[in-house]
Amino acid sequence: DKNCVLQAEGSDQWGNITTGIDLIRKKTGKEAYGFTMPLVLDKTGKKFGKSEGNALWLDKNKTSSYELYQYLVNVDDSLVIDYLKIFTFLSKEEIEEYERKNNEHPEAREAHIALAREIITDIRGEEEYLKAKKISDCLFKGDITLLDEDELEDAFKGAPSFDINVGDKVIDMLINAK
């Protein structure tokens, strides 16, 4: 229907690739092809994905831009340059410059911030990147009162919380906290 003749998957998905190629051939009568790409692993060698419970979603309703920003600026130093090479359209020279800066002043996190900027801007737009950066800057360097209600919700989505009633005693709240 979509004139698809290429099945692309992670290197651990060879069975899915061959099944996809067979399906394309049977449905269209056309030749189909497959290719694999290396898996993206975390610093412990664990792959990313739904089944691993550590998926990063393109859909901002599943992974907010702030969550994605925080993940990317906290990527292990040993992975950030590889991620710039894999996930961005930065030139070889730009990446080499970030690598130099990262080696000289890792605490500045310039490569990490570039990674977050490039990925979020590419998949969600500059406005989402700027919103995520604003939330992060307000929480970690500035004034949280500068955040609007939506930004606060993004910042604290998933944080442990519970409802309280006005007039409850502190001791009762502590006992009922989960």
Q: What role is predicted for each listed range?
A:
Residues 24-178:
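Conserved nucleotide- and phosphate/pyrophosphate-binding catalytic cores
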